[in-house]
Every structure is written in structure tokens, then in C-alpha cells.
Design a protein with these regions (language model features):
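Non-catalytic substrate-recognition and accessory regions of acyl/acetyltransferase enzymes
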Residues: 1-226
């Protein structure tokens, strides 16, 4: 009985915290990249993001593809419920959410003010049936986690409808880009033909895009953050 009550209590606490989660898309993605909307502009992996002061148009490729790219955010505790939804002006954490061509919803690297919120994001992903990165880094070859399930990810693709843009964001995981067909991937591909298509790599933080022929298999900028 004590175990059951403890379990119910934990579920209740999680449900209360989950109220503060939201999934946004379009121009709201660039909004919540901005440091002015962070709970703290200088603390945690969120406050240390290298993209926090970048202009909104750097994120156009996200905003123009809402069916493929969204963002999961955790609001701070200073908000309020309006029309049944919790809203606040500041966020405690964020992570991109990718709708892959392979059918998996994958939550990317989690940027948070507090380390403990990483586990909350993983639980929120599990609740929604999404996969997430087991380790919070910029590795393209990663282990994907969903609750107790784990799998080694070799090759995901994200086919974009709108990809003609002048500026590009730094991307942690799905950084390989086929500009001819508008496809993002966490790998240059499984065949030589695939590798010849992924000619670009989103590893720069100044709005430009790198060429893969100058990059090694994992990307030279794996320690940068998004």
C-alpha cells in the first residue's frame, strides 16, 4: 500500500509539472531561442547556448517546416493558467522535436537551467511516445531512449518542404543537409550516393553553412551548443 501511494504521489507531481510543458512551432521557435525569454541568461546549458542572441531569421528553416520541426519548452513557475493552458513569459528548458521520415518522433538535445529538468523532459517524451537522446550532447551518432528502451541510431532523415533560406542555425544532431532535395540527417548516409548528396553541414553559429568535404564523420564542432 505504501508503494502504491508513493507511486500515485509521484504520478501526481509529474502531472502537475507536465502542465508547464508546451510544444510550439513556427515563429515561436525563434522566440524561445532568445535569451530574453530564458529564466536565466547565464546559467545552465540553456543560459550558455551559443544561439541565444541570434536574429530570428537564422531559424527560418525551423519556422517554415512546422510539420517536421517543433520545440518542446518548459515554462518557469511564475506563469498562470489561461483557457486551460499554462503560459509564462520565461522558459526553464527547451529541446527541438523532429518528425523523422522513419516514423519516429525524436526529441533532440535538452538545454536546461537546471540539470534535474533533463529527466523531466525524458519522462515527458516517454509519456508522449517520443524517443529522445540518452546523452545530452551534439553527437550525430547517438543512442535513443524511450523510457527503459534504448536503441542505437544510425540513420534518420527529415524531408523538408521549405528549405530555400539564406541563413542557417547551428544544429546539434540532424546537421547533415542535402540542399538539392531538402533533407536533414544525423548521418551522411549509408551509401556513397547518399554521402555525395549531403554536401553541407550545419555546424556554424554565424548563419552560414559548412561544406561536408571539410568535416570529419562526426563533425569538427561537436562541442558547440545550440
Amino acid at each position: 500500500e505504501m508503494f502504491v501511494n508513493s507511486y500515485k504521489s509521484e504520478i501526481g507531481l509529474l502531472n502537475n509539472v507536465f502542465i508547464r510543458f508546451d510544444v510550439v512551432e513556427g515563429d515561436l521557435i525563434s522566440k524561445f531561442y532568445k535569451a530574453s525569454n530564458y529564466y536565466s541568461e547565464s546559467s545552465g546549458t540553456l543560459g550558455n547556448s551559443c544561439m541565444k542572441y541570434k536574429p530570428s531569421y537564422y531559424f527560418d528553416i525551423y519556422a517554415k517546416n512546422p510539420e517536421k520541426i517543433k520545440m518542446v519548452i518548459l515554462y518557469d513557475e511564475d506563469g498562470q493558467i489561461s483557457d486551460g493552458k499554462y503560459k509564462s513569459n520565461k522558459i526553464m528548458a527547451r529541446a527541438l522535436l523532429w518528425n523523422t521520415d522513419q516514423g519516429d518522433m525524436v526529441m533532440d538535445r535538452i538545454y536546461s537551467y537546471q540539470d534535474k529538468d533533463v529527466e523531466l523532459f525524458k519522462r515527458f517524451a516517454e509519456k508522449n511516445g517520443w524517443w529522445c537522446k540518452k546523452t545530452q550532447d551534439s553527437e550525430c551518432n547517438f543512442i535513443s531512449q524511450r523510457g527503459e528502451e534504448n536503441k542505437k541510431v544510425k540513420y534518420y532523415t527529415i524531408s523538408l518542404k521549405e528549405f530555400d533560406t539564406e541563413y542557417y542555425p547551428y544544429v546539434d544532431t540532424f546537421a547533415y543537409f542535402d540542399p538539392k532535395n531538402g533533407i536533414l540527417s544525423n548521418s551522411q548516409g549509408l551509401t556513397d550516393k547518399d554521402k555525395s548528396n549531403y554536401t553541407h553541414y550545419m555546424s556554424n553559429t554565424d548563419g552560414t553553412i559548412a561544406m561536408t568535404r571539410y568535416m570529419d564523420g562526426d563533425g569538427d564542432d561537436e562541442d558547440d551548443d545550440n
